[in-house]
Amino acid sequence: MEGRWIGRWHSDYNQHNGVLRCLLMKKEGSTYFTRFHAKYKWGLLTISYPYDMDMTITQNGAKYEFTGEADLGKLAGGVYQYNGTGTTNRIDINYRADKDHGTFKLERPEDSE
């Protein structure tokens, strides 16, 4: 599961969406350092929002299960909970906060991405 991932995020709450990049690095056991870098358009502006968190990733056969939590600060919506599933080629994560919820869809990038 370690390495680079790329895809999109989508808010089911307000329909915001954009490009999402992710880097997963194993720390120890089932804990992975996770760096997300989300982008979205707000009018003519492109907003870039990077953040880090630890995720728990456990393997169940050929599938992986993801859980985590991150406090993105009051302006970004507060505390977000994450859970999802994946394979070595695709990750689908649901996220939820008090005033937002949606999905992350990630795949392995092409070498040029």
Go through each PLM region and give its residues.
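Central antiparallel beta-sheet cores of small beta-barrel/beta-sandwich binding domains
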Residues: 1-113
